[in-house]
Design a protein with these regions (language model features):
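Flexible, acidic/Gly-rich N-terminal and inter-domain linker regions that tether
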Residues: 1-139, 143-258, 420
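Conserved non-cysteine loop/helix-boundary elements of the Radical SAM core domain that shape
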Residues: 122-139, 159, 163-183, 194-344, ...
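C-terminal scaffold of the Radical SAM
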Residues: 185-186, 252-255, 288, 292-298, ...
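Intrinsically disordered, low-complexity terminal tails and inter-domain linkers enriched
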Residues: 519-571
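Conserved acetyl-CoA-binding loop-helix of GNAT-fold acetyltransferases
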Residues: 597-616
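Conserved GNAT acetyl-CoA-binding A-motif
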Residues: 616-629
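Conserved active-site alpha-helix within GNAT-family acetyltransferase domains
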Residues: 629-648
């Protein structure tokens, strides 16, 4: 390994630029031929971890290579695995909450009792979570290590918290989960401290006799899973039996508690940490979005909500047992927008009762009706998974998957109507083909859609298609464009830096709330607080009362302290006359904080976007402007004149 690395370093010194994939492959293949081993002794994925190990543990050898910052940058860019993982400008870390009863029972939703509702064991993020006992600290710490070994910079991290419905979990568990996410980020710069924490946490779960090996977990859940798949048990009943009544899980759950003050302390550390949270995403259902729930999410540091919409056709929603009205979905969008959250909607084609025509009409409504208008969309086809209620409809012929042509036509039509301020993040779920009984199993579905769009000569305006990615950026080529649009509660301005060919190097989402919408939301928040106060659950939204929660609720009860921690907050944290910056994002390969980048970041583009947003808000008559800053971006916005103001940072105009 050492000789291979030295050959690469020599080539980099000679070329003065990163090696392309072919040149690197030739070096690796030549070394493997020299070694003549039974297996490949040298592989790209092993080289960067080896280099980092030498740098940390063998300083004499590392110094002998005469590596300066410029050469190290070339080496990392040459050996980085999957460079697109951080091309959007941020290193993403996805974590899952533990299996837990769900207050809903949708027809198509998977019932894998080893996972939180709707997720499947073989999905990559799920595998990582299960190996780490669904522990947030372990998931973050080990994922950061993996990304670093792959050559990715991890000082700016977006945390994505998945697991069905966030507010279905006990509040003290939610606080603990967030505290541990931030603690993992805060300790990541101290390898010894983090190693000690990882070792201690693993030992704790082992003392609780909770297994994390694949075969053991399969055996642990086999009988109950069979009964769930056959319809003898519900998902909630099985989760109660497996986890709520299990002594090991009860012991672990008893320790999975924290207060909001605990979270706030980790937030304070993260403001100037080496690994900062620049975004925090929480997944929930639209019927769980209330002023109180959003206030708590904001207090925990969240900046984006993922909402499972699935359809905007009431008949289809009812047929799939969604148990929600379009008016309730619309109100979820309105409230999330007023609170400043980015809105990431899940939209599913080919549900029971759907047709290609109805799917296209529903998606068009999602991106054109002012009651909705998400910022980001996961747009994927319904997958038939064993053990779901949809299986019976497939067997009796009342549901069948779209043909490949029908599905591509739907997705192509949807892409063509997607506005320039919307990012289509996904077109498939990470579901293994062996879990899909019928329907689309092609992992390159998006590529197929892109190829069909190109064949038709169709114009596509959505963000992901236009992202500048890892390519270099000539600032003189960029122009600032503005795209205005209206929602039922605000006037929105999407500001974007674009190249002459329409590529996007950065953008800002500015919301100009309507005064009557702010007043209505304040009244709703005060009414919600009053109702909760009457039930002795001051200042927060009600927990789900599903009976199957009770076994584990007894493990981690919601104390009076946890109920009242947010009581000091205003019922509604916003006022009329305040504009809101909901997102600022600059693309390009992630640059380490304080280091140079060849991409679009750290070029003043973000500052100019914020300055223009302030001008627009001032001209529109707003007196102040808020920003829904992540914990790790507070310092940046402070440098632009924003001050901490309750749950947001604010600047007078």
């Amino acid at each position: 390994m050492q000789k291979t690395l030295e050959i690469i370093l020599s080539a980099l010194k000679e070329q003065g630029q990163p090696l392309d994939a072919n040149a690197l492959d030739r070096i690796i293949r030549a070394r493997n031929r020299e070694l003549r081993g039974p297996v490949r002794a040298v592989a790209k994925k092993k080289l960067l971890p080896f280099y980092q190990q030498v740098k940390e543990n063998d300083p004499a050898l590392w110094r002998s290579w005469n590596i300066d910052d410029a050469l190290e940058s070339l080496l990392v860019r040459t050996l980085r695995m999957k460079p697109m993982r951080t091309a959007s400008g941020v290193a993403t870390v996805t974590v899952l909450t533990k299996p837990w009863p769900c207050a809903s029972a949708c027809l198509y939703c998977p019932n894998d009792i080893r996972m939180p509702k709707s997720y499947l064991t073989d999905e990559p993020a799920c595998q990582r979570a299960e190996r780490n006992w669904f522990d947030p600290y372990l998931q973050v710490a080990l994922r950061l290590r993996t990304l670093a070994d792959m050559g990715h910079t991890t000082d700016k991290v977006e945390l994505i918290v998945l697991g069905g419905t966030w507010t279905d979990y006990p509040r003290k568990y939610r606080f603990w989960f967030m505290r541990e996410l931030f603690r993992a980020l805060n300790e990541a710069a101290d390898a010894k401290a983090q190693h000690a924490s990882i070792t201690e946490r693993r030992a704790f779960y082992e003392r609780c006799n909770i297994r994390n090996e694949r075969d053991d977990l399969a055996a642990f859940s086999r009988d109950e899973q069979t009964r769930v798949t056959c319809g003898e048990l519900t998902y909630n009943q099985a989760v109660r039996d497996l986890y709520g009544a299990n002594e090991g899980w009860r012991q672990a759950s008893a320790c999975q508690t924290a207060t909001l003050s605990d979270v706030s302390r980790e937030h304070a550390r993260n403001v100037q940490a080496a690994h900062r949270s620049v975004g925090l995403v929480i997944e929930t259902r639209p019927d769980c979005i209330t002023p109180g729930a959003l206030t708590e999410m904001r207090a925990l540091g969240a900046t984006k909500v993922q909402i499972g919409i699935q359809s905007l056709d009431q008949q289809i929603l009812d047929a799939n047992l969604r148990r929600i009205s379009l008016d309730r979905i619309a109100r979820a969008f309105e409230l999330a927008r007023l609170f400043g959250f980015k809105i990431h909607a899940h939209f599913m084609a080919n549900l029971y009762g759907a047709t290609p025509k109805r799917d296209v009409e529903g998606y068009r409504a999602l991106v054109t009706d002012g009651r909705f208008l998400p910022d980001e969309v996961k747009m994927y086809p319904c997958a038939l998974v064993d053990g779901t209620g949809l299986v019976a409809h497939w067997r009796d012929g009342s549901w069948k998957p779209y043909t490949e042509g029908e599905l591509i036509d739907v997705l192509v039509a949807n892409m063509q109507v997607t506005p320039p301020y919307v990012r289509v993040s996904r077109m498939i779920r990470d579901i293994s083909s062996h879990d899909i009984m019928t329907g689309n199993k092609k992992v390159n579905l998006r590529q197929m859609v892109d190829e069909e769009l190109a064949r038709r000569g169709a114009a596509v305006a959505e963000i992901r298609t236009r992202e500048i990615g890892t390519r270099g950026t000539d600032l003189s080529d960029l122009a600032l464009a503005e795209f205005p649009y209206e929602t039922t509660v605000s006037s929105e301005r999407f500001l974007q830096w674009v190249t002459p060919d329409g590529k996007i190097a950065g953008f800002l989402r500015l919301s100009l709330p309507k005064a009557d919408a702010i007043a209505a939301a304040r009244t709703e928040a005060e009414n919600e607080r009053g109702l909760i106060g009457e039930r002795g659950r001051k200042a927060m939204p009600p927990e789900s009362e599903d009976a199957s929660h009770q076994a584990e609720r007894d493990i981690a009860p919601t104390s009076a302290d946890a109920q009242s921690e947010l009581a000091a907050q205003d019922a509604f944290p916003l006022s009329a006359g305040e504009a809101m910056i909901r997102e600022v994002h600059v693309y390009g390969a992630v640059a380490a904080l304080g280091h140079a980048s060849t991409g679009a970041q750290h070029t003043g583009l973000g500052r100019k976007l914020v300055a223009r947003a302030c001008d627009i808000a001032r001209e529109a008559g707003y007196e102040r402007i808020n920003v829904i800053s992540a914990v790790g971006t507070r310092e940046y916005y402070a440098s632009l004149g924003f001050e901490q103001h309750g749950l947001y940072q604010q600047k007078k105009l």
